[in-house]
């Protein structure tokens, strides 16, 4: 549970009013193994400047990275798409499984019950980030806010409460993979060189929202100026980037395949692919290997998180799902194993 909370604090769903900022993709593609490229966009590979020097230490130094050709989901994986996977395979997500008594002997049966992290909100600026979240028994991708909630009307929303192994299981069912951090960032930049945001260098404009993020002082109040107040949006509600990809900024955090280390590798053109598990390191929790998550979420505000930029990166524990964490997949051309798998 501590790992899950660490993931939540990386970037801070409670029920709230919602209005649509603009038309969304009416019917996102629901893929299956018979249509391996359905709902994906082909991205031609190349060399790009990965990372940033001016924002946060873990994002630099900028380096030249080469990525090959690949296909990537046009949108985040939706509830409808994940439901098809579960129906076909009988898969049970980590949030739906109880903790084992052998691994957690000091916890009671109730404390080991299936649960996940849900954003609780805050009526004031609490100095304790742990108060912003609740471990909710029964919360999972099927019930995003816990018992009593469901997916009715949310078929096109991004699936959440997904741990890294859940995302990998879905990807492998389709013969796909999770993107490396370099592939994800290359795709998010959409062909722009060195831009601060996925849409360019211009600061976010509340009159023409480009992404689902938090408007206002987090966690006290979200004005909902972007059309969605303190919650995820259906996929494709905001303009696509230069490669035709939606929601590469905000909405929900997205898993990558890479293990996390603060900072990037030394300069020089290198091939995409992150460090091995043995090299993973999070200074905040040494000894607990984590994966890189990218893109920020609907909880990212300028006063807290501010990670809805393509260079931004933060660690996520593999067993940590929450109400603001989802994913998308890639299909490489040709497919190949990535170091560190």
Protein language model features and the residues they cover:
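Functional-site microenvironments in short loops/helix caps that host divalent-cation chemistry
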Residues: 18-23, 42-43, 49, 54, ...
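Short, structured beta-strand segments at or near domain termini in extracellular proteins/domains
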Residues: 323-337
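Short proline/glycine-enriched turn/loop segments at secondary-structure junctions
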Residues: 281-285, 314-321
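Short capping motifs at secondary-structure boundaries
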Residues: 70, 85-94, 174
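Short, solvent-exposed alpha-helical surface patches in non-cytosolic proteins
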Residues: 74, 79-86, 163-169, 185
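N-terminal pre-domain segments of enzymes
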Residues: 17-34
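C-terminal motif of bacterial Sec signal peptides marking the signal peptidase cleavage site
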Residues: 10-11
């Amino acid at each position: 549970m501590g790992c899950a909370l660490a993931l939540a604090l990386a970037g801070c769903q409670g029920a709230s009013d919602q209005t649509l900022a603009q038309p969304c993709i009416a019917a996102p593609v629901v893929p299956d193994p018979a249509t391996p490229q359905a709902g994906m966009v082909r991205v031609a590979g190349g060399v790009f400047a990965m990372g940033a020097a001016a924002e946060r230490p873990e994002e630099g130094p900028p380096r030249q990275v080469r990525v090959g050709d690949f296909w990537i989901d046009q949108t985040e994986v939706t509830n409808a798409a994940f439901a098809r996977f579960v129906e076909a395979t009988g898969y049970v997500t980590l949030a739906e499984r109880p903790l084992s008594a052998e691994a957690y002997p000091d916890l009671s049966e109730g404390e080991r019950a299936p649960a996940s992290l849900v954003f609780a909100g805050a009526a004031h600026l609490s100095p304790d980030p742990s108060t912003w979240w609740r471990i909710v028994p029964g919360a999972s991708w099927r019930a995003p806010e816990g018992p009593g909630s469901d997916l009715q009307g949310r078929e096109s929303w991004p699936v959440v409460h997904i741990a890294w192994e859940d995302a990998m299981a879905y990807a492998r069912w389709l013969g796909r993979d999770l993107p490396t951090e370099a592939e994800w960032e290359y795709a998010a930049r959409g062909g722009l060189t060195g831009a601060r945001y996925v849409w360019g260098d211009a600061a976010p404009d509340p009159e023409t929202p480009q992404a689902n993020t938090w408007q206002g002082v987090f966690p006290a109040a979200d004005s909902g100026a972007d059309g969605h107040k303190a919650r995820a949006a259906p996929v494709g509600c905001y303009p696509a980037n230069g490669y035709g990809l939606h929601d590469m900024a905000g909405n929900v955090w997205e898993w990558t395949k890479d293990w996390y280390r603060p900072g990037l590798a030394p300069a020089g053109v290198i091939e995409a692919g992150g460090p091995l598990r043995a090299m993973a390191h999070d200074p905040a929790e040494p000894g607990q290997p984590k994966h890189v998550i990218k893109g920020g979420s609907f909880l990212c505000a300028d006063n807290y998180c501010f990670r809805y930029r393509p260079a931004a990166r933060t660690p996520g524990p593999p067993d940590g799902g929450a109400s603001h964490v989802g994913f998308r997949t890639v299909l490489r051309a040709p497919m190949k194993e990535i170091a560190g798998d």
